[in-house]
Design a protein with these regions (language model features):
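Exposed, low-structure sequence patches enriched in small/polar residues
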Residues: 90, 201-207, 213-214
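Surface-exposed loop/interface segments of Gram-negative outer-membrane beta-barrel transport/assembly proteins
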Residues: 1-70, 88-199
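A conserved hydrophobic secondary-structure block that centers on an alpha-helix together
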Residues: 78-87, 92
């Protein structure tokens, strides 16, 4: 069976940060309700009593989108080459991918301080599973026994990257042209990891008259 999903999110800064990092709820609660949304020049107004607090309406202009994709699948095959012997292979995959794109325009207080800020990040996770088993069962009169032997293997892959820039000429590029920013040291990072787990297992059961069991 396989299941594929894709979700798109328009993120809203609801966080409980302080000052220029305040989220919409914090800013709305603390902002002076008598101050108009925009001033006479059409810019977002600031709170005279708390100039470091962003205008809560301006935070709605932050462009912050996330895409999440997932593939979850499993399959198995079982054969019986001879009577009493069953061979089974079970395979599974869990792939998760997400990408986030953020742009803080100059109309926001924090974006104005840095002349616009863009950020991109993505991560890819791939997990694989393989189980192989051999199960043999035999009955001789009042005696019966069962032997199971198996091998299990799991592999985990993770890789990701992030990049950003600020100091843009205008807000039109959003996060689609990081090279247009003029920040002297734009942040760039990447990472990757691989790990695996393997094991062998076995079991032996002997029964006599279906009353006594040795394992």
């Amino acid at each position: 069976s396989f299941n594929i999903s894709r979700n798109n999110y328009d993120n809203v800064p609801l966080g409980n940060g302080e000052n220029e990092n305040s989220g919409i709820i914090t800013a709305a609660v603390a902002f002076n309700p008598t101050v108009p949304v925009r001033d006479e020049k059409g810019n977002y107004s600031t709170n005279p009593q708390m100039p470091q607090l962003p205008n809560p309406v301006s935070l709605l202009e932050i462009n912050d989108k996330t895409v999440k994709e997932r593939l979850l699948g499993s399959a198995y095959i079982e054969v019986e080459p001879i009577k009493g012997l069953k061979l089974k292979a079970n395979l599974g995959i869990d792939r998760k991918y997400q990408k986030r794109k953020t742009y803080l325009p100059k109309t926001t207080q924090y974006g104005a301080a840095v002349n616009g800020q863009a950020y991109l990040a993505q991560e890819d996770n791939n997990d694989y599973l393989m189980d192989l088993t051999a199960n043999y069962q035999k009955i001789f009169g009042e005696h019966s026994f069962n032997v199971l032997f198996g091998y299990s293997y799991q592999k985990f892959n993770t890789e990701g990257m992030s990049a950003g820039n600020q100091d843009f000429i205008n807000d039109s590029f959003l996060y689609n042209n990081l090279g247009a920013g003029n920040y002297s040291r734009p942040p760039v990072g990447s990472y990757a990891s691989v790990s695996s787990l393997s094991s062998y297992f076995g079991r032996f059961n002997y029964s006599w008259k279906e009353k006594y069991l040795l394992t």
